[in-house]
Amino acid sequence: MVTFWAETAASAATTSKGEPPSKKRKTNPSPPPSLLSLPDVLILNCLSRIPKSYYPKLSIVSKTFRDLIISIDLNHARFHHKTQEHFFHVCLKLPDRPLPSWYTLWIKPQGFDDKEEEKKKKKKSTLVQVPSSYASQTPLLVVGIDSDVYAFKQCYPPSRVMFVRNKECVIWRNAPDMTVARANPVAYVFDRKIYVMGGCAETESANWGEVFDPKTQTWEPLPVPSPELRFSSMIRKIEMIQGKFYVRSNDSKDSVYDPIREKWNVAAKPQLNDSRCSVGNVWYSCRPNSFLWFDNEIKNWRLIKGLSSLNHSCRSGLIETVCYDGNLLLLWDKPTKPRRRVCEDKYICCALISFNKRKNGQVWGKVEWSNVVLTVPSSYRFLRSTVIRT
C-alpha cells in the first residue's frame, strides 16, 4: 500500500513539473492530503518502508518530504524497520574539478513508468552525484570486527576521526582518533586488527600506514614504505593474497606488505582486463572475450553461457566488477564516438548479471539490464568503488 502511494505521488510530481499548465491532460491522483498533515514521525515511518529509488521524485512533492528524505532521522528509521538496501558508489576524478567526486547508482524501480513503451526507451539506471535526494551523504568506508562496525570518512577535508557502533545499534560514536588526518583512506581487517593506509599529506609520510587494535584501543604505525611505494593518488583497494596485503593503486604500480616480516615491496599489476569477483561461494572472471566461473570440483575455469552480446559490448574498457545483491555488477567505459581517433568524451556503462546453474552443471548468465549511466571527459580517472547498506 505504501509503495502504491509512492508511485502515485511520484507520478503526480513528474506530471506537474514536466507539462505546461495550459496543456490539457488527464489529472493524476495527488498524494492523500491527510498524509501530508500527519506528524513528521509518522511520515518518516512511511518513507522508511519505501525503496530509495522513489526518493528523487518524492522529494519534489513537498518541502516536508524533501527535508525528511535528506535527514539523518530517515536513516535511523530505515535501520529500525530493517528496510535498508545495498547501494553501489563510485569515486571519479574529473579534469574540471579539484577534488574527487562521488556518485551513486540509481536503479529505476519496477513499475515506475505507466506505459510499456516508455520502459523500453528510458534508462534502467544512472549514476547520480552525491549529495542528492537519492544519497544525501558521501558513503563511509566501513569494516567490521565481531559485533562492532568501524567507519572512516571518504571526503575532504582530511580527518583523523574513526567512528564505531554495535551492529545492532544505528548511532555512531567516536573511536580513538588516527594519528594523522586522512582523506579517502583505505582499511582492511586482518588478525582482528584494522589496517589503515594512504590519504595523508606528504609531510605525514612516516604515518602512511597504521594499525588499530580494538582490544587495547590503540594505534601503532606500520613500517614506512619507500617513496616509490607511497602512491600519489587514492588507493583503490586492498586484497589479501597468501597472507600478504596487496595494495592496489591507480598509479602505474602496486605494492605488497608482509605483516609477518613487516616489509614492503613492489607488486605486479593484475592481468589487464581480467577482473575477478566472488558472488556467493563462486568466483567469476570477466575477460576481454569471455566470462568464466571457477568450478571447485574440477579446480578449473569454465565458460559462462548466454553472455555473448555483453562480451561484445565490454570486451575492452572494463573498470570494475562487484557483488551486488547476489548478482554481478559490471562497470566499463567506451568512447562516445568510437570511429574517431580522438574522442573528447566517454560513456560509463553498467550491467547487472544474474546466474543460473543448470542440471548439467553448466552456468548460464542473464543480463538483467545494461545501459549508459554517465558521460564523462575522456581524461577522467576511476578511483574507487564501494557497496554500502543504508
From Swiss-Prot:
The keyword Ligase does not apply. The keyword Repeat applies. It holds the Pfam family Kelch_FKB95. Residues 1-33 are annotated as: Disordered. Keywords: Kelch repeat, Repeat. Residues 1-16 have a biased composition (Low complexity). Signal peptide: none annotated. Kelch repeats lie at residues 139-192, 193-243, 245-286, 288-321. InterPro entries: F-box-like_dom_sf, F-box/kelch-repeat_ARATH, F-box_dom, Kelch-typ_b-propeller. Residues 32-79 form the F-box domain. This is F-box/kelch-repeat protein At4g39753.
